[in-house]
Amino acid sequence: MMEATGLEGLESTSSPCPGSTGTGLSWDNGTRHNATFPEPLPALYVLLPVVYSVICAVGLVGNAAVICVILRAPKMKTVTHVFILNLAIADGLFTLVLPTNIAEHLLQRWPFGEVLCKLVLAIDHCNIFSSVYFLAAMSIDRYLVVLATARSRRMPRRTVHRAKVASLCVWLGVTVAVLPFLTFAGVYNNELQVTSCGLSFPRPERAWFQASRIYTLVLGFVVPMCTLCVLYADLLRRLRALRLHSGAKALGKAKRKVSLLVLAVLAVGLLCWTPFHLASIVALTTDLPQTPLVIIVSYVVTSLSYTSSCLNPFLYAFLDHSFRKSLRTACRCQGA
């Protein structure tokens, strides 16, 4: 299961590491709720289920609304909305399995069996990769649109069908990226004989565990973020050149085409996921003791990454006029 970010160091142990989406990969001898964290923070036992429940409820309702509106409204059949739809599906799937995290936390054991353990861990890890890669797809699409507009060119190849194909490729890539975690996922008994859902690596466990962190960090953050940084740096350079050589008309038109919605979704995604991956770097490079402060920071970072799954619908409602209009129409139809 996804747990605290694991800011604590990696200790040598023969037990499987707790399951996680990559945030809570602390190297210890149990889950986050029994052996991982001692009892000096009993407030977490009450607070975490409340936070997770709010995220789950808001995320399920919000993403379900996004999916229904985009599928039913003719005006929402655009390239950008294809990517938004897939991002909502990914976030919705994650919030759908979040109750298992809540149940595990309250029961302090895994009660759901091997099959559901593998499924939940797979969806957990899918959320890491799918979120960032659909954000990247939206940003790359916006980059190409701005460049084409600035050059007064059309984009006949930019179609909804191609966006669907690109989305399918993202899902296939994410599935391949998650397969290694699915292979090692399973139910085990920790040293306290408590049933847990986690990742069971072969020996040497420490090396495998470190490799899993690096794998998630590189594929789930470094590669897509470096790509986006290069693209946006190139975009700024080109727009600056247009201002110098082509006059303000093309530049103004290009600026108008920059989608505030895409930039806002990207910014929120980075805000929610950057601390998550920075925590992985800290865990790989330092050996922090399991102090109350480290435990609290770990859970805060984990909860922040969870929050990304429920914030996007609010951005669409505030920044996307067509989405607001279609949502109001759908609500009126339901009321009638």
From Swiss-Prot:
InterPro entries: GPCR_Rhodpsn (IPR000276), GPCR_Rhodpsn_7TM (IPR017452), Neuropept_B/W_rcpt (IPR009150). Keywords: Cell membrane, Disulfide bond, G-protein coupled receptor, Glycoprotein, Membrane, Receptor, Transducer, Transmembrane, Transmembrane helix. SUPFAM superfamilies: Family A G protein-coupled receptor-like. Residues 1-45, 104-127, 189-213, 280-293 are extracellular. The chain crosses the membrane at residues 46-68, 81-103, 128-146, 166-188, 214-236, 257-279, 294-316. It is a multi-pass membrane protein. GO terms for cellular component: neuron projection; plasma membrane. Residues 12-25 have a biased composition (Low complexity). Disulfide bonds join C117-C197. Residues 1-25 are annotated as: Disordered. Residues 69-80, 147-165, 237-256, 317-336 are cytoplasmic. Glycans are attached at N29, N34. It comes from the Eukaryota. GO terms for biological process: neuropeptide signaling pathway. It holds the Pfam family 7tm_1. It is found in: Cell membrane. Gene3D superfamilies: Rhodopsin 7-helix transmembrane proteins. Its main location: membrane. Belongs to the G-protein coupled receptor 1 family. This is Neuropeptides B/W receptor type 2.
